[in-house]
């Protein structure tokens, strides 16, 4: 696993990016061309740079919260043999389920997606229960969370620890959800 620090003007706020699947630069250029052909447009330069530097990755600070929206990033998509991590496969799977100008770029807890506008580079939160245009009655536009990916990553904070009340509820219900992907990511971060 490779680790890089995301460029930030304040060193103490630096967000470390854990690269889960590195990809050689010559293969990366080919895959970016394939992605741009698939989506029918040239990617915003800041997102193309992010993909080139990180491919499939997870930021150490991965929690987003503002007045109305809160979520945790599982990992950013990239180019992968694993269909669940591959940005092209995910784009194809969700085509028609979100606005045409958006594409998923990161897995979010609960089956949601962080998306980017293919033309403007603005970043949106796609909440599957309200924004899945493939379901009858759902046609709400996803929530704008940042003007660009760099600003979004700078807004991320460490995932908060559960409150005592949340721990009590989990113990009382006897249910703790651990997905295979979360185990894989935790193991990769320990390596």
Regions found by a protein language model. Name each.
Residues 125-126:
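Short hydrophobic/aromatic-rich beta-strand segments that constitute the beta-sheet cores
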Residues 129-158:
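Compact, glycine/acidic-enriched structural inserts
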Residues 117-120:
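Short acidic-glycine loop/turn motifs at beta-strand connectors
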Residues 149-177:
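Mixed-charge (acidic/basic) macromolecular-recognition segments
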Residues 2-113, 163-169, 178-191:
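A surface-exposed partner-binding patch
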